[in-house]
Structures are given as structure tokens and as C-alpha cells.
Amino acid sequence: MGWTAAALLFAGAGCSGALTYTIAGTAKSADLDGKIVATPNKDRGMTVVKIDLQHLAPPERLGNGKTFVAWTKDEKGKWGRIGALKYEEGARKGTFEEATVPLTSFDLLISVEADPAVDAPTSEPFLVQHIN
């Protein structure tokens, strides 16, 4: 068995398979479409998350800020910042290519922030999805 095949087998061990969550509008952004793909690895206690949002209104229309930030919230209510989404204003598209979070069951939230480095959301999230 080659190194690549062995690495792929090792990387796949403990994986639970990708979970796809379809987003079809929210109270604050009715035209929003997209998906969140979460690939949990329960053996390692982590999840790889990808976010792809279409028809996403500019951040200024959804809150007081210029940056979309993705967050996790664990069962105890502790916040974790995943990072800022890449926003393409002309295409009205928001993406986060890939992040690994140290949880396998959590709420994923997206808020609008003036400072993408804050420790917790400062505005009401416009998108909330439970990942499990």
C-alpha cells in the first residue's frame, strides 16, 4: 500500500461522513440560499466545516458592521470564533472554505461584526444551524 493510500485510510478512520445542511432563507435574510457541510471526526472530537452562502445581502443591511463572522456555541454556551467569511459583494456570495473546530455537536452561527477579531458575537446572529 502506498503512502498516499495509507494516509487516506488513516485520515478517514473515525470519520462519521459529511453532513450537509441546506439553508433556505432566514428571518433577517429571506433570499439567502446555501449550504453548510460538516464532516465530524468523533474519535478526534472535531469537525471540519465549510460554508457556502448565495444571495447574501451586504453585511451593512443585516447588522452594524462590515464583516460576516462564523461562530460555534457549545452545549455549555461557550463561544468560539471560526473566522470571517469571504464576501463577494457583486456576486452576493459568502464562503468559508474550510475550518476545523474542536467540537462534534454545536450550534453554528453567523453574525455581522465591526471587528472580525471579537471574542463573542456583538450582534444578533442572522443564521443559526445546529450541527450534530
Task: Label each PLM-derived region with a short phrase.
Residues 15-132:
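N-terminal targeting/export leaders
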